[in-house]
């Protein structure tokens, strides 16, 4: 009887801690991109290669799944629903998107990528450090090689929480 009560107590404790963490996950929801800055490691140079009117959404769900999609400013529309090869290259080169699962602690979230616009990211873990201030979420990548220009550095993204409809 004592053993059963002990096992039951331990199980309830684990479930309550898990439920409490799930209820307190500050990243849950949808976020809209407000700023995207790239910082070059060698020089400290900071630049925004995505344009003034950046587009992007980031989502974290309670089931542990996430997605990110970002497009550059002023993307050209293809001339037809079936783009030319040149149009495809330009469209591919002006976006970042991936989805997968995530794990987190008090300072970082790790995106475990299941599917990606660039197959080389699929199956990788993308480490992101985060900071919350009100409805703003700042995410800074771990040092990495930029998939657009190849330079080493980090990305600093500011997201604003999207209110439910």
Task: Give each language-model segment a name.
Residues 1-10:
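Bacterial N-terminal signal peptides that target proteins for export
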Residues 15, 19-165:
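Lipid interaction determinants
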């Amino acid at each position: 009887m004592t053993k059963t009560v002990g096992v039951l107590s331990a199980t309830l404790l684990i479930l309550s801690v898990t439920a409490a963490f799930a209820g307190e996950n500050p990243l849950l929801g949808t976020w809209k991109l407000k700023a995207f800055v790239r910082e070059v490691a060698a020089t400290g140079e900071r630049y925004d290669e995505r344009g003034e009117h950046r587009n992007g959404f980031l989502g974290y769900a309670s089931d542990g799944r996430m997605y990110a999609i970002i497009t550059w400013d002023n993307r050209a529309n293809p001339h037809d629903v079936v783009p030319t090869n040149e149009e495809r290259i330009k469209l591919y080169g002006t976006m970042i998107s991936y989805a997968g699962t995530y794990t987190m602690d008090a300072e970082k979230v790790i995106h475990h990528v299941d599917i990606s616009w660039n197959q080389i990211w699929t199956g990788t873990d993308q480490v992101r450090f985060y900071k919350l201030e009100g409805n703003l979420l700042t995410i800074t990548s771990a040092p990495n090689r930029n998939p657009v220009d190849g330079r080493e550095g980090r990305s600093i993204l500011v997201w604003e929480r999207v209110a439910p409809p």
